From Swiss-Prot:
GO MF term list: photoreceptor activity
KW Ligase (keyword) present: no
Biological-process GO terms, alphabetical: phototransduction; regulation of DNA-templated transcription
Name assigned to this protein: Photoactive yellow protein
Keywords, in A-Z order: Chromophore, Photoreceptor protein, Receptor, Sensory transduction
Statement: the UniProt record of this protein carries the keyword Cytoplasm: no
Gene3D superfamilies: PAS domain (3.30.450.20)
């Protein structure tokens, strides 16, 4: 199985065809619905964020899981997806984890149906 690199333009189509591949990605992957609820949270993201993936499914990403991201550019890009169903943006982001600032690259990419958006996270 080929490795899917971070930032791959058609990653949404690959994961739509083969959803199980999200678990083998070498970077974090979170699937959010248009309201920001978590539908999928892979193991790599669990390691980056220090969370058990099974405990976050169905929870509000911006209010319960990553409130530090609310009100920032990252959240603003998600709100555009909420309104339009479209997203494909990469940005640099820093979050505080256990008292240390962690730099990551974020790729927000909507699924073709416009109902879900992938949030890919890679340590910078």
């Amino acid at each position: 199985m080929e490795i899917i690199p971070f930032g791959t333009n058609d990653i949404d189509n690959i994961l739509a065809r083969e959803p199980a591949r999200a678990e083998s990605l070498p970077f974090g992957a979170v699937l959010l619905d248009r309201m920001g609820r978590i539908a999928k949270y892979n193991k790599a993201e669990g390691l980056i964020a220090g969370r058990d993936p099974s405990t976050v499914i169905g929870r509000d990403f911006f209010n319960e899981i990553a409130p530090c991201a609310k009100g920032k550019r990252f959240h603003g890009e998600f709100l555009k997806f909420n309104r339009t169903g479209q997203a494909n943006v990469m940005l640099d982001y820093k979050f505080n984890y256990k008292g240390a600032e962690v730099a990551v690259k974020i790729h927000l990419k909507s699924q073709p149906d416009g109902q879900f958006c992938w949030l890919f996270v890679k340590r910078a």
